[in-house]
């Protein structure tokens, strides 16, 4: 039951204030996509966001059952992160021992980054869960090979690719483990430790362990004779023989992922320039900022990095798989990000549990109380960021975008026949989606729209080419613009701005964090 405390703690922390921060721009994209009919959702994937299409389809079914409130939209991510913490503990137990697993899971539970992505209606929490699950299933398949275990691994990898394409860089770490088992033996990959920790190296003895002479007798691992597999482990010779086919079985297990994810990759590749046009090329300084980025706290990220380095040294070869699961995806995405716009820290959140596993090994050699004090320290260091991420999901956290506040102003002052105009329209701020989410059927008519998001199979609506004509019948216009503007109409460019300034007068302006809403009349 080593998984239970981390899972329960993660669930409790992640549910705290889960709906306090309003949906931010990426979550608004999820809401817009997932609330469309399946046919329109498929068409959207052909235009933009194909890589996230399977997640949108999952959320479409979820919303049909549980609705689209902020809590309902984020609950799948909360559950996924809670399960991730439990599986991280289980993976640590399988690779090292129960104490390392417990500490790893608890560290993951208290990270601000865990709460941040647990409280977001995006695929990162689910991808993190599948990354840990796939790695755990790989360990099981390499230790006790069977087609059922390899089939489970194949399903997890395929689901991982469908959820988050970049998370498939994890397969580089899996390949290292498989090749070491194939060419040498499980010990070379750090997979020879019995899951119950029956034998630990001398350097891994905890201070509260009894002296060697006082320990109960434990049978040594099997000597490789036929049938010499004991509960919780198996004969090393038997594992070696099974390892002869590890590479072939692993490659076969990747076939479903190739068949399912391959077409998605081809479509997503064609959308890259539009999807990631805001991403800058990767720089070396980005690597230094990564721990704080994925942990959502510079202090906690630094602590986690230091603990992981100490833990890796303590674990020796048993650190190989978790260390590879951190380093290889990071290096691969960084190398690709130098050439193409790909380097976004949150894309690497799936590596965090493996860093926690290494970090959990650092204090595992002391008594439980001091070891837990390290977890408490990480939690205390992250408290300011925990509070901040529950205020807003924008970054920096001072850059709040208050869609809810704008919607409240309009709801309090609107009259029948009012219309609404947004500027800019084609922006990642999704001004129209933000107000539509909070106002629902009460939102004034979007007067300039001639082709809405569903009709365009896009995340943005299309506006009329002659704004003055489209505004001809309007008497009162609600204008929503990005940023603080003392004269909102003057901030609207082009023909749209000219039509507003020539035909209307600004009657009242309401500044809100990140936005300005104004009422214009003839």
Question: Residues of each region from the PLM?
Answer:
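Intrinsically disordered, low-complexity terminal tails and inter-domain linkers enriched
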Residues: 182-245
């Amino acid at each position: 039951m080593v998984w239970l405390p981390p899972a329960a703690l993660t669930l409790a922390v992640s549910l705290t204030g889960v709906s306090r921060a309003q949906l931010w721009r990426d979550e608004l994209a999820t809401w817009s996509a997932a609330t469309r009919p399946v046919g329109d959702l498929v068409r959207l994937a052909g235009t933009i966001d194909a890589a996230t299409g399977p997640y949108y389809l999952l959320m479409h079914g979820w919303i049909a059952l549980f609705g689209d409130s902020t809590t309902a939209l984020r609950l799948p991510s909360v559950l996924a992160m809670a399960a991730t913490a439990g599986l991280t503990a289980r993976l640590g137990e399988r690779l090292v021992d129960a104490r390392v697993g417990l500490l790893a899971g608890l560290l993951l539970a208290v990270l601000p980054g865990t709460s941040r992505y647990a409280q977001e209606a995006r695929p990162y929490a689910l991808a993190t869960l599948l990354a840990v699950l796939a790695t755990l299933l790989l360990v099981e398949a390499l230790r006790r090979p069977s087609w059922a275990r390899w089939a489970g691994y194949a399903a997890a990898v395929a689901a991982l690719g469908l959820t988050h394409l970049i998370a498939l860089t994890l397969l580089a770490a899996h390949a290292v483990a498989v090749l070491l088992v194939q060419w040498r033996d499980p010990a070379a990959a750090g997979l020879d430790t019995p899951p119950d920790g029956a034998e630990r190296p001398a350097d891994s003895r905890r201070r509260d362990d009894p002296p060697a002479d006082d320990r109960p007798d434990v049978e040594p691992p099997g000597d490789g004779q036929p049938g010499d597999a004991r509960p919780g482990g198996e004969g090393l010779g038997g594992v070696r023989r099974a390892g002869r086919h590890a590479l072939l079985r692993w490659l076969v297990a990747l076939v479903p992922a190739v068949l399912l994810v391959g077409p998605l990759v081809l479509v997503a590749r064609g959308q890259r320039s539009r999807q990631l046009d805001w991403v800058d090329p990767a720089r070396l300084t980005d690597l230094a900022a990564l721990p704080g980025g994925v942990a959502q706290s510079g202090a906690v990220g630094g602590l986690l990095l230091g603990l992981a380095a100490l833990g890796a040294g303590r674990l020796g070869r048993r650190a190989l798989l978790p260390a590879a699961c951190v380093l290889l995806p990071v290096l691969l995405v960084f190398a690709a990000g130098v050439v193409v716009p790909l380097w976004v820290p949150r894309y690497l959140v799936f590596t965090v549990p493996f860093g926690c596993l290494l970090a959990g090994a650092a204090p595992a050699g002391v008594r439980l109380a001091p070891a837990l004090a390290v977890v408490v320290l990480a939690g205390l260091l992250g408290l300011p960021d925990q509070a901040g991420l529950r205020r807003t999901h924008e970054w920096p956290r001072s850059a709040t975008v208050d869609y809810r506040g704008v919607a409240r102003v309009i709801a309090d002052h609107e009259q029948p026949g009012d219309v609404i105009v947004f500027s800019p329209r084609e922006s990642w701020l999704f001004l129209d989606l933000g107000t539509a989410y909070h106002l629902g059927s009460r939102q004034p008519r979007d007067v300039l729209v001639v082709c809405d998001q569903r009709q365009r199979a896009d995340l943005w609506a299309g506006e009329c080419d002659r704004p003055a004509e489209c505004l001809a019948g309007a008497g009162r216009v609600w204008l929503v613009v990005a940023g603080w503007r003392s004269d909102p109409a003057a901030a609207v460019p082009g023909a749209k701005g000219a039509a507003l300034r020539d035909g209307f007068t600004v009657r009242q302006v309401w500044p809100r964090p990140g936005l300005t809403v104004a009422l214009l009349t003839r």
